[in-house]
Amino acid sequence: MSASAARSRNKQSKLRDDEQLDISKDEFNRIQEAFGREEFRKLFFDYVEEIQDPENRKIYEEEITQLEKERGVEVRFIHPKPGFVIKTALDGELKCFINIAGSEEIERPKNEVATDPSSGSRGLSWSIPMAQTSSRDDCDAKNNHCKVFDVVFHPDALHLAKRNKQFRQCLIDTALDAVEREYKVSLDRANLKFPKLDYKGIPRPTVIRKLADNPTAEEQEPHPLAHMFPTKPPAPGKPEPRVLPMKTKPTPVPEFTVPRYSIKHSHDVDLSEYTDELDAKLHVTVPRSLVVEIELPLLRSTAECQLDVTSKSVYLFSERQGAKYRLKLDLPFSVDDKAGQARFDTDMRRLSITLPVVRKSTKEEAQMHDTLRHFSREDSGVELHSNSESPVEEDPDGELSDSKADISEISSPTTATVRLANSPFLKNSVHYQLPSKFDCNVLDNVMAFVLHVPNVQPDSIEQLREQRSLHLQFATIGSGYYPTHYAFYVELPAEHEDSAIESVEAEAWDNNVVLKLCLSSQSETPASYLAGLDATELKEYPVHGQYNVKSSGKANAKENAPLDVKFVHNQEGQALKVTIRPGTKEEEEKGNQDQEPESDKQHQQQSQNKKAGKKQRKRNKKERSLSESACADMIFQEPLAKNPELQPKTMFKFPSQRKQRSYSECNDSIGGSHRGILKRFSRYGPRPSMSDSCSSIDDCSSYSCSVDASGTSLFSHSFGGIPEEDRSDAGLSESCKKTVRFNDHIMKQVFRLDSSILGQRKKNQKRRDLKLRAQQRRLSEGDSVDYEETRGSALKQQENQSRNCNKPNGGSVLHDSGLDLTGAPGAHSNHNESEAKNALMFEMDD
C-alpha cells in the first residue's frame, strides 16, 4: 500500500511539478490579512506589471548576462517564436501540448550525403539542433489541467517543415523523442492532433550557458587556495556538443492505442464471515464485484466509443480521429454482464465499469474443494476413521481381542456410463493405454477383474457391453494434474459358445479398479479369456483362481462325517486304549436304528474321542495323563460300582513329547466347539490383564474340570464357559468351580496427532517387554520355592496311597494320582486323598 501511494505521489509530482511549500499557519494568516487590505493588493499588482513589462525583462536579461560573464560563463537567452502545436496524451492519463517553436539562437540544421546500410540507396543525413524548456502546468479550453512542453528549433527548420512533409514528420518525431527521453514519460503517438494554434500558453525564455571563449582578467588571476589542491588536467581539445544517437529503425506506430486501465476488487463487509462456522470464509477470496477503470483522456463522451461486456471479458473500441482506442481485457472472475453499470467522468475523462461477480453455491464450492483435496492427497499408508477419531494405542499387557478388528474404508460402487454400440467408443484424438497389470478370478458364474491403476476418476469410467465382450475406458489424474487415459477390452473364449454376459459392475478404488462380469446361468466356467486394448489387439490370458461353492460344500460335509471311536480296557496294564477311525455307511445306518439308551451311551463314548493334551516338565520330561485330575474319579462311578472287577486305570497312550495337551475323558463332544472366556495360560508364563485373579484350579491347570449338578452330564465341557453356581453342588469342592473377577480400572489410551505411528508402536513394544521381564522375574523368585515344597509333600502322599491300595481289605483301585474311581465311601472320607489330589494337580502343570 505504501509503495503504491509513493508511486502515485511521484507521478503527480512529475505531472504537475508540485513543490512542497513549507509555510506555517502564522505566515498563512499574515498573507491572508495582507491580501485583505486594498493598499497591499495595489502594490502587488504593480509588481506583477513591472515584471511582465518587456523593457524591464530586457534590462533584467542584460544584468544577468553581465553577471555571468564576470564569472567566465557565456549566457544566451532563447525567446521561442510560435510555430505549430502537437496535442496528445501523457501516460494515457493527462492531456498535454508540445509547442514546436523557433529561435535564432539555435544552430541551423545541417545535412550530408549518406548511404542507407539496409538498402544501399543514397540520401541526406540531417543533423537538427534543438533546445527544450522546462515543463509547465496550464489549462485547456474547458479549464482542465494539462501539461505544456516547448521544443525550440532554428527558423530554417520550421521553414523546411512547411515545404516538405517528410522533414515535418522527422521534426515531429525528434520533438516527441526529446520529451520522452528528458522527462521519462510515454506519449500517445497513435492519437496525435494538430490544433489550430501557433503556441499554447505564454512564451517563457530559457537560458543556454557555456564557458566563455575569452575569459576576463579577474578570472585569469589564480585563486588564493589553488596551490592547496591538485590542478585539473587540461582538456585534450575543444569540447564538442552532445550528439544524440540516430535511430536506425523507425519505431512502428500502432493504429490503435491501448488505454491505461486498472481492475479493483470490491468487497463489502459481511458479518457472517467473522463467525466460527465451517463455511464462514468460503467466499473470503472472492470479491463481491469488479471495478474496471479505463483512462480515456482524448474522448469527450462514451458516445464516441463502443463497449461490450461478457461474463469473462471487457472489449472497448473507439475509431474517432485523434482518439483511436482498442482494449480487450480478460476478467479474473465470472461476472453478471446483465447487472453491470458503467459511468464516464467527463472531468477526469475516466470510464468506470462495475460488474457484480457470480459466486458459486455452497454445494458447488464444497464439491470443488473435495475434488481438489482428493487429487492432491498423498497416501501415507495410514487409514483414518471417517469421524476423525485417533487410532487406539495397542494394549501394553496383551493383544486386543478378535472382536476389535481393523475397519477398512469401503468404497461405494461407481455407476459407469454405458454407451451404445453404434457410437464410436474410443476417441481418435486421445491416446489410450492398456493397464500394465491386471488379474482375473472366477467364482461360480462371476468373473472378477482387478485392474491395478491408482487414482481413477469415478466419473471417467465408461463401458460398452455386448453379448460376449466388454469394452471399458477410464482416466486417472497424476501428480501434475495431467490426465492419463486407459482402455480395457475383454472377450469370452470361442470354445464356450453358450456363455454370455448378463450384467457388468465397475468400482473405482484408491489403488485399482474392480470389474465384475456376471455370466448367464448356462455359461460354463472359463479357464481363460481374451484381453487387450481393443478388439484388434487381443491376447489370451489364463484365469488365476477358480472357486466352486457347491463342490466345496460337499467336501466339507464329507470331512465332518462322524468318527468311529473304540475303547479297549487292558486288565494287565490297567490302561485304556482308544482307537479312532472314520465310520462306514453301514455303521451309520445301524447307529440310526439304535434306541435312546444306546444313543446316550454313544454320546458318552464320543465325549472321549478328542485328543487329550499333556504338559511335561522341562527338566525330567515326566508324563502324566489328564485323566488323573480331581474329577476323573466320577466318570465311571456307577458302572464300576456294579462291576467291581473291571476297575482299570484309564490312561491314554500317546508318544512322549514335550508340552502336549489332550482332552479329558470327562469331556462332552457336543459342547467341545464352545470356548470359555477364561484364558488358558501356563503357571510360569505371562498372565492376561483382563482379569485380576482366578480360582486355584485355573492357576494350576490349563484345562477346566468344573462339575455341575445335572443328572445327565456330571461334568462340564473341557473348553466350555463358566458354569452357573447352583445350590445343589454345594457339597462339591470349591476348587472344581470356575470363578473370575474383572478389574474396575479402565485403561485409557491417548494418541497424539503430531506423533509418528511407527515411533509410538516401538515405544509401546519396549514398554511391554520391560513389564513382561519384570513379571517373569517375580514369578520365578516366588514360585520356585512353593513348587519344591508342594512336590515333596505330594510324593509322600502318593507313597501312602500306594500302600493303601495294596491292602487286601481296601477293595479300591486307585490311580497314581490318588483318586478313587470306584466310588467307595472310604475314598471320599479320606482327607489325605483330597490333599494328594490337589497337590498332584499343581504338579501336572509345568
From Swiss-Prot:
- Region (Disordered) location: 216-240, 372-405, 574-631, 762-846
State a GO cellular component annotated for this protein.
Answer: cytoplasm
Give the UniProt subcellular location, in the record's own words: Cytoplasm
| Role, per record | Required for cytoplasmic pre-assembly of axonemal dyneins, thereby playing a central role in motility in cilia and flagella. Involved in pre-assembly of dynein arm complexes in the cytoplasm before intraflagellar transport loads them for the ciliary compartment.
A single GO BP: cilium-dependent cell motility
Q: Where is the composition biased (Acidic residues)?
A: 391-400
- Where is composition skewed (Basic and acidic residues) in this entry? 372-382, 583-603
Query: What is the protein named?
Result: Protein kintoun
Compositional bias ranges of the Basic residues kind: 611-622, 762-776
Keywords annotated in UniProt: Cytoplasm, Phosphoprotein
What is one Pfam family matched by this protein? PIH1_CS
